[in-house]
């Protein structure tokens, strides 16, 4: 299983958001959950003057959390990633996260 990190593109494989994909905003390792952009939005009611970011208060919409076991890392082409390692591509000078996919069935 590929390790999920901030900025990865993931696809939800279980729950009410099943089949949707988005970018990971935050990984909460101790809780075993992730925040995914534009998925599992929750509403929070905030009083006036409680935060400097939103002094007028009101109803705020923010990304909720999803269990890590309910998401799967996908590549740029929306296909699942099976293996991942940190290394250099041929001719590259910098290390990067390299992804491998399952071999096609013949």
Swiss-Prot record:
GO molecular function per UniProt: rRNA binding; structural constituent of ribosome
Domain of life: Bacteria
Keyword RNA-binding: yes
SMART domains associated with the record: KOW (SM00739)
One Pfam family recorded for the sequence: ribosomal_L24
Biased segments, Basic and acidic residues type: 84-97
Protein name: Large ribosomal subunit protein uL24
């Amino acid at each position: 299983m590929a390790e999920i990190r901030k900025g990865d593109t993931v696809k939800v494989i279980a729950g009410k958001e099943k089949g949707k994909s988005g970018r990971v905003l935050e990984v909460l390792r101790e809780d075993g959950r992730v925040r995914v952009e534009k998925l599992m939005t929750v509403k929070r009611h905030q009083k006036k003057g409680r935060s400097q970011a939103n002094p007028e208060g009101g109803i705020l919409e923010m990304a909720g959390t999803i269990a890590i076991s309910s998401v799967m890392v996908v590549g740029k082409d929306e296909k699942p990633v099976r293996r991942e390692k940190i290394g250099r591509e041929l001719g590259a000078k910098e290390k990067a996260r390299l992804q491998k996919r399952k071999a096609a069935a013949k």
